[in-house]
Amino acid sequence: MQLPANPFKAALRRAEPLYGIWAGFATPYAAEIIATTGYDWMLVDGEHAPNTVPTLLGQLQAVAPYATHPVVRAVQGDTVLIKQLLDVGVQTLMVPMVETAEQARELVRAMRYPPHGVRGVGGGLTRATRWDAVPDYIRTAHEQLCLIVQIESPRGVAHAAEIAAVEGVDAVFIGPADLSTGMGHAGDASQGEVQEAIRRTVQATLAAGKACGILAPREEDARRYADWGCRFIAVGIDISLLRQAALANLGRYRATQATDQAAPASRTY
């Protein structure tokens, strides 16, 4: 069989706008529900959600029949962990808190086989090779793998141009929450200096010929970042959407109850 294509990587190269959603429930059932909704991509979070390699595998299998592409965020840029994630079939990998070009180069090496990298060969044990059903996987795997590095600290912003220019880095993703916190604004990315840092990072990424993405659940933020040149934007978080919908639903009934209690008693006998 042929090596599965990576439509997300191809779309990034065509500079298409891609709208995504954060997936934090860490269950295949929830991931599959999200995959039916039509988002271009979903971020399966291995950093802040309670995921492990087996739970990530289950979610990859659950969403495989659908068009929504799974991007998996590792908990950290560990070479051994990256090997495991690629072996279970991750094609698009996001790594948090990348601050230097050297870090980015090491991540590229972790995703490639020798002599261009250090990825170990799992052969017929791995889902990525479809258990040895994909011929020449070792030689061609890099063609369909996509590496996204996260810039989410002042140090990362300072080195954004060098990071984005690293060969093998396909895209940069900005983390506004960590960036703003690192700049002394406790998660408030609306502050002027944080916005300027985001803009500079987008510009540096585009100047290197790479795609830039960001998390922006608020529509006005998402549209502004798109105007600046971001092409893949996460516009929602599944856990937040569930909580907001649950609160809004209950609020309608609480409001009705309060209105009923405030109404005068009927004088009709």
Swiss-Prot record:
Catalytic residues (UniProt): H48 (proton acceptor)
Listed GO MF terms: 2-dehydro-3-deoxyglucarate aldolase activity; metal ion binding
Stored Pfam families: HpcH_HpaI
GO cellular component, as recorded: cytoplasm
InterPro entries associated with the record: Aldolase/citrate-lyase_domain, HpcH-HpaI_aldolase, Pyrv/PenolPyrv_kinase-like_dom, Pyrv_kinase-like_dom_sf
EC number: 4.1.2.-
Site (Increases basicity of active site His): D87
Catalyses which reaction(s): D-glyceraldehyde + pyruvate = 2-dehydro-3-deoxy-L-galactonate
Record protein name field: Hydroxypyruvate/pyruvate aldolase
